Amino acid sequence: ANVRQLIHDVLIPGGIDGILTPNDLVALLLEGELLSAGLTIPGDIALVGFDNEPFSACAQIPITTIDQNNGSIAEYAIRMLLDIIQDQNSCHVARKISVQPELVIRKTS
């Protein structure tokens, strides 16, 4: 009930045109509530999730999402762990690794 109240009290009168959610599950739940409130997605409001969960592509309106590239993160972590295992006597220096996320554009934006 709190989400419905927020939609009616804040989103509709506030002129908000998009929402970035912390994950795809929240985006999926919010999608249902927005549609129930009579809003169109992405017409009235755009919606973007985070995680690129498989279900986000199969939602009533497939959800645009940010893929944080977990495969690359895991690959870097495994490589670093193997380096430590193979060279246990050396001093290991912290490394900064950047993995580029990807915007997966679907129907909610």
Stretch-by-stretch model annotation:
Residues A1:
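Short beta-strand elements in bilobed, periplasmic/extracellular small-molecule ligand-binding domains
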